[in-house]
């Protein structure tokens, strides 16, 4: 990892927890040592963004797990970046594979969300990744480059964007991409950014890995030169998340 890229660890709590259990988790996180050279962001369920921001130590940022592409309006069940900021969160996760494949969000919609979230001043954790059949068909690069292109077309300021490579076959399955598999895709993504955006953006943009990251797998993954951090699911709800935060130490 280049020294200019600050290690980034996101915890995606998904649709989990209640105030009591999340309060206990927050207590653990507040007591944890967070290295000065590591950025930590937690993404609670929407109903608990306010709660998490009030309880979490300021050293840990808060993200929403999703947002919509416009400011206000007749969009029942949606939240806007402006609302997210009003609750004290500063980041949003967009394009997560569960949004793409469970809720049918298209590349185009995700791109529009990215553009609006950035315009409203949120940082964006933009997720990309291939399914198992796509990897087996040998089209991993084609899929992730197409997804990345739509995101890229909607980004003006790369300083507020973190790319999260999440192979769909490794999310919640217990299968983790090997450090070599992760590094290979991250390196190719950085090369794509260099060719299609700029060398400066390729060098400065953090590309983090998601997909069954645990306390046991994080250190070797973190040692790869193009792995700049993690987006953690299940393990972010457990005390081992502290080990993942400290994976570079």
Swiss-Prot record:
Its EC number is 5.3.1.1, 4.2.3.3. There is a cross-link at residue 142 (Glycyl lysine isopeptide (Lys-Gly) (interchain with G-Cter in SUMO1)). It is found in: Cytoplasm. The keyword Ubl conjugation applies. InterPro entries: Aldolase_TIM, TIM_sf, TrioseP_Isoase_bac/euk, Triosephosphate_isomerase, Triosephosphate_isomerase_AS. The modification N6-methyllysine is found at residue 194. The active site is at residues 96, 166. The modification N6-succinyllysine is found at residues 149, 156, 194. GO terms for molecular function: methylglyoxal synthase activity; protein homodimerization activity; triose-phosphate isomerase activity. It catalyses: dihydroxyacetone phosphate = methylglyoxal + phosphate; D-glyceraldehyde 3-phosphate = dihydroxyacetone phosphate. Keywords: Acetylation, Cytoplasm, Gluconeogenesis, Glycolysis, Isomerase, Isopeptide bond, Lyase, Methylation, Nitration, Phosphoprotein, Ubl conjugation. Belongs to the triosephosphate isomerase family. Homodimer. This is Triosephosphate isomerase.
